[in-house]
UniProtKB/Swiss-Prot annotation:
Its cofactor is FMN. The lineage of its organism: Eukaryota, Fungi, Dikarya, Ascomycota, Saccharomycotina. One of its GO terms (cellular component) is nucleus. It comes from Yarrowia lipolytica (strain CLIB 122 / E 150). It holds the Pfam family Dus. This is tRNA-dihydrouridine(47) synthase [NAD(P)(+)]. Transmembrane segments: none annotated. A zinc finger (C3H1-type) spans 88-122, 135-160. It catalyses: 5,6-dihydrouridine(47) in tRNA + NAD(+) = uridine(47) in tRNA + NADH + H(+); 5,6-dihydrouridine(47) in tRNA + NADP(+) = uridine(47) in tRNA + NADPH + H(+); a 5,6-dihydrouridine in mRNA + NAD(+) = a uridine in mRNA + NADH + H(+); a 5,6-dihydrouridine in mRNA + NADP(+) = a uridine in mRNA + NADPH + H(+). Residues 47-59 have a biased composition (Low complexity).
Amino acid sequence: MSDEPVVKKTKVEDLPDTIVDSVYEKQLAEGRVRGVASIKPEYLVARASADARDAPPSVNDDLAEGGEKPEEKKKGGQNKNRSLKQRKDAIKMCSSALQFKEDGSPQECSYGDKCKFEHDLQKYLESKPKDIEGVCPVFDLTGQCPQGYKCRWLSSHRDSEGKLLVDEEKKKANADNKELNHVFKHLNPLQRKKYDLSKSDEAIKLIDAQIVRDEDDEQTKLEKKETIEIDTGRIRPSEKKKLDLKGKYIVSPLTTVGNLPYRRLMKDLGADVTYGEMALTLPLIQGHKAEWALTRCHSSEVTEGNHFGVQVTAPKHWQAIKAAQAVSELCTGISEINLNCGCPIDLVYRQGAGSALMDQQGKTARIVRGMSMVSGDVPITVKMRTGTGSTPTAKKLTARLLAEGQTAAFTLHGRSRAQRYTKLADWNYIREVADSVVNTRDDVREKSELDDHVISHPTWVVGNGDCYTWSDWHRAVDEAHVDSVMVARGALIKPWIFEEVESRQHIDKSATERLEYFQKFAQYGLEHWGSDQYGVNQTRRYLCEFMSFTHRYVPSGILEYLPAKMNDRPDLWKGRDEMETLLGSSDYRDWIKVTERFLGPVGDEFEFTPKHKSNAYPTESG
């Protein structure tokens, strides 16, 4: 595909004043009620009382991004102090005791008598709960279970003599099925400040010493000369990897629910571009294991034609610069480093990161410029909101960053930080920003022919907000003039959304098909977190987090009107079969019941508390 942007030549006078869903507006005129998902009469269930209609606010991107909402009624709101830490085995085996020599004897422990872990394998096996019935999903797929004797499906890959089985044929066939960006050996140098970040130190000095542009010409020339001297040998923006986001199917970075197993599922369902969960730059450069885990990806996310991006946010330019260097050098296969200028979390905002960068355009420009200096051939992109308050500032910020010529793509979420989800995303403003970028990027490209400090390919514009159907996606591209649409909630509630976009039709997935998605998520989760007791509990927890979104899907076959709207609320309904009703339950105990189909019975050690004290959209079982 050509790097040249395909811009529809539409006369300004031919454009509507506002972007509207004409089909939806026509249905409203014919009797459809705004804000209500009308259910066909045969699927309605009588309510026990009028009070049952009260429901807390629907799910929103802020929750997916780890954000907070203003206080709600006491009966609703969030369980902010919920405990999600899963307990591990009561008896912990020494890793050496689980590794065997060729003669079948266990490896000797380097700690000897001082080791605090168990070495008696039989004692450990007797302490384990009864094996889960069936075949280990990891062994079934890959031919080998990394958890070995700790696996909850141990009997499925252990012979009569007690030895672990390996299916060499499957193992060889799945050699490319692996996770990337395990950087454990580099964490210690980062923690001890021994990792070489001299390139970043050099760039930071340059950024700190830069002279304001409105000074006299002599000083400006001096600045340019110093820039060239310090920057010699560094990869220029014009030499970086070229992004292609035109018409791509993009999944938004999502806190908690945007984990690696979920992204693998979305890759199977047609996603082209995925992102890791947002990482904080200071913990990255300090070598925090948990933060670096957010940069991991699966091999399927970086195959040809696919893109994986690492998203970071920073309150200081020096943190962003050092993190960009470390990420670009230690992570393989990444297509971009995305700077989050839209995160609404209060803790992040108060530090001057996330959406706070929207109001500090000079600082944001320095951050992007510095990150681009040290990120090698990895381009820098920016995700933002319309602004922090009622006055939108995104257009001004994009103009500033475009002038710098270091930003490969902008993603604009059509809401402000303060607005949150009180209103729909403002796609008219997104169009205004997109048009300004399209009109400017030709000039930027011409400038790049004379100055290799400027990117040489189009600066893409991606819209974000309220995309739930194929018509939402295509209307955004056609009328808002964005190059593509980043989907967040729509891909959580309805993971097959890109299949609908591709076929341009509403797809009525059965309960059986939706269960297959959960089964695949469970399999990917066990590969990622492990098939031992801890891994099973982690997989179950994140599958429940996933279902806290998917249960909000109202099957299109029971709706009176299509297209469905994400924020429309249905009345109490029942599905076309018992399982469909169960999958629509807002009771988290029903979600746990569904997980037992793939992960076995729930043990006493499992802990899960839903994000909400109560859940919206009650069904017959909820």
